[in-house]
UniProtKB/Swiss-Prot annotation:
The gene is troC. CDD domains: TM_ABC_iron-siderophores_like. It is a multi-pass membrane protein. It is found in: Cell membrane. This is Zinc transport system membrane protein TroC. It holds the Pfam family ABC-3. GO terms for cellular component: ATP-binding cassette (ABC) transporter complex. GO terms for biological process: response to zinc ion; transmembrane transport; zinc ion transport.
Length: 298
């Protein structure tokens, strides 16, 4: 107990835990709607699309200020989103295809730029590699405040437009009849996903950020059919994984926080898939076995 208290008294760990806690809460919440809308790959595409913006922001300004780099990430993510929409509306390529194109092209371009930076005299002070898999230990107090502020905004917007988001997610036509704009809700959800991705890339990285959006919702879906409960569970799973991953990585030297958070989330998702009521693998096996026995007795 004393060792745990001493661990949490560490200033760096306090920042990391608070940052990843709120990041997990917000990502789990907004990711629930993305999963229900079958847009899981969208978060993946946006997170990968942020990499070129991060590198370009550094090349243009010569600074590795978190605010500047995240601004570049946000602009690049928005460009990637616009490209996806244009591809879907002007070609016969479906949603998954458009998202896959953006994911591959932007990630490849980002790595090309990153290679260029690493070969330049500025490479030693760039520190851009941390955005690939994340480096939560570099989070400062101002970064934590930014994460908290953005995740609180996400939570408030979801609460404020709960009815509209719910209707547009499950029945777009009925939502339009009720006077709500499905397109507006889709735009808002897209913006929230971009915000969640941008504030999370420093801690989790562009490669793994999509897992923080989808895994909590996938795990929560195994336990409930209620949207309200699903969102609450997804936020809880995201927050727990953030705190757990931060503590574990702090205890083990040279262990990156982002991958550990994703591993914890993967464990939660696997347990949920196996043990979830009604949907769980074990429940389905037990149900089939029971039906088989009843048929044999009959």
């Amino acid at each position: 107990m004393h060792a745990l208290m001493r661990l949490f008294s560490d200033y760096t760990l306090q920042n990391v835990v608070l940052g990843t806690l709120f990041l997990g809460l917000g990502s789990g919440l907004v990711g629930s709607f993305a999963v229900l809308r079958r847009q899981s790959l969208f978060g993946d595409a946006v997170s990968h699309a942020t990499l070129p913006g991060i590198v370009i922001a550094f090349l243009l300004t010569g600074t590795k200020s978190t605010e500047i780099l995240l601004l570049g990430a946000a602009l690049s993510g928005l460009v990637g989103t616009v490209v996806m929409l244009m591809v879907m509306r002007t070609t016969k390529i479906d949603t998954d295809g458009a998202q896959g194109i953006v994911l591959g092209v932007f990630l490849g371009f980002g790595f090309l730029l990153l290679t260029h930076v690493q070969k330049s005299p500025q490479a030693a002070k760039a520190g851009l590699n941390k955005f690939i898999l994340g480096q939560a230990a570099t989070i400062l107090q101002r970064d934590v405040l930014l994460i908290i502020a953005m995740e609180v905004v996400i939570g408030l917007l979801v609460l404020l437009f709960w009815k509209e988001l719910k209707l547009s997610t499950f029945d777009r036509d009925f939502s339009a009849v009720q006077g709500f704009s499905p397109q507006l809700m889709e735009f808002m959800l897209t913006a929230l996903i971009v915000v969640a991705v941008v504030v999370g890339v420093q801690a989790v990285g562009v490669i793994l950020m999509s897992a923080l959006l989808t895994a909590p919702a996938v795990a929560a879906r195994q336990w409930t059919n209620s949207l309200r409960v699903l969102c609450a569970l997804a936020a809880l799973f995201g927050g727990v994984s953030g705190v757990s991953g931060s503590v574990v990585s702090a205890q083990v030297p040279r262990l990156s926080t982002g991958p550990v958070i994703v591993l914890v989330l993967t464990g939660i998702a696997l347990v949920s898939i196996m043990l979830g009521p009604q949907r769980g693998v074990l429940y389905q096996l037990w149900r089939r076995r029971r039906v088989s026995l009843l048929q044999e007795e009959g």
